[in-house]
Swiss-Prot record:
Binding site for Mg(2+) 1: 248, 260
Record organism: Idiomarina loihiensis (strain ATCC BAA-735 / DSM 15497 / L2-TR)
UniProt-annotated binding residues for Mg(2+) 2: 260, 262
Keywords: ATP-binding, Ligase, Magnesium, Manganese, Metal-binding, Nucleotide-binding, Protein biosynthesis
Family: Belongs to the RimK family.
Binding residues for Mn(2+) 2: 260, 262
Record carries keyword Manganese: yes
Binding site for Mn(2+) 1: 248, 260
Record-given protein name: Probable alpha-L-glutamate ligase
EC number: 6.3.2.-
Length: 301
């Protein structure tokens, strides 16, 4: 197969591993910076160009699109879908998963366990918003944040009110969530491919920190999932419409709770923690499933 990987940095661990895994199986791989791709959209024959030349046809596309370039990156991916390339994750599903509030609304509709979450825009609603999620301590998250940036633990009601007022004053979109104390600063990253969890790791926050992101100094270790955790992760990925996803779960006293569904999960932490070849399993999925115009939206966007 001819495979395109949409990535702004060919030297990133995840991108390198996907290239290695694909080439080991005899596939031809090109790493394309989505910001350097541009589109010709017309009624006769749409195309994608780079450096003044039309790109060749790719059998499938692996999107590794950063959160900061979601709009343009998904537009490029959508163009690939329109001309018949099979996307590992579809543009619609990526856009859906990048909207944290929309994701939680979709997951809640399917009855998937979540931390109680509140969303409001007016200062007069702050007291009720805090009560809605069980009072302090509580977690306040900017909707645009990634890798733990823009996530605040407010340990008292006064602190919560101050942070919420500040975010409202800055006209930032944020949500308020109950704090799951029993999780102990740990979460579980489940790597879902198709309808299976193929790898899982426990991420533990460093001392004095509640965010378990590896980018924030958290540590990763192997973890054994319960059947409920496994089923929750698969159902969450399926609800988002993602073929490959990193599903972040908290262990609570009332079962697994989904924190986030990531459409472009990093491979380094989970491959090192589990010693599993995740990249090759992604390529295997493409070999079995990649067919022209085979998308849930039939390439219609």
């Amino acid at each position: 197969m001819r495979i395109a990987i949409l990535s702004r940095n060919a030297s990133l661990y995840s991108t390198r591993r996907l290239v290695e895994a694909a080439e080991e199986r005899g596939h031809e791989v090109d790493v394309l910076n989505p910001l350097r791709c541009y589109m010709n959209i017309n009624a006769r024959e749409s195309s994608i160009h780079k450096h003044g030349k039309e790109l060749p046809h790719y059998d499938c596309v692996i999107p590794r699109i950063g959160a900061s370039v979601t709009f343009y990156g998904t537009a490029v991916l959508r163009q690939f879908e329109m001309i018949g390339s099979y996307p590992l994750n579809e543009s619609v599903a990526i856009s859906r998963s990048r909207d944290k509030l929309r994701s939680l609304q979709l997951l809640s509709r399917k009855g998937i366990g979540l931390p109680t979450t509140g969303f409001a825009s007016q200062p007069q609603d702050i007291p009720d918003l805090i009560d809605m999620v069980g009072g302090a301590p509580l977690v306040i998250k900017l909707l645009e944040g990634t890798q733990g940036i823009g996530v605040v633990l407010a340990e008292t009601r006064q602190a919560a009110e101050s942070v919420i007022e500040a975010f409202m004053g800055l006209h930032s979109n944020f949500m308020v969530q109950e704090y799951i104390k029993e999780a102990g600063g740990a979460d579980i990253r489940c790597l879902v491919i198709g309808d299976k969890v193929i790898a899982a790791m426990k991420r533990q926050a460093k001392a004095g920190e509640f965010r378990s992101n590896l980018h924030r100094g958290g540590s990763a270790s192997l973890v054994k999932l319960t059947p409920a955790e496994r089923a929750t992760a698969v159902k969450a990925a399926k609800t988002m419409g993602l073929n490959v996803a990193g599903v972040d779960i908290l262990r609570s006293n009332h079962g697994p709770l989904v924190m986030e569904v990531n459409s472009s999960p990093g491979l380094e932490g989970i491959e090192q923690a589990t010693e599993k070849d995740v990249a090759s399993q992604i390529i295997t999925f493409l070999e079995k499933n990649a067919k022209a115009h085979k998308t849930r939206t039939k390439g219609q966007g």
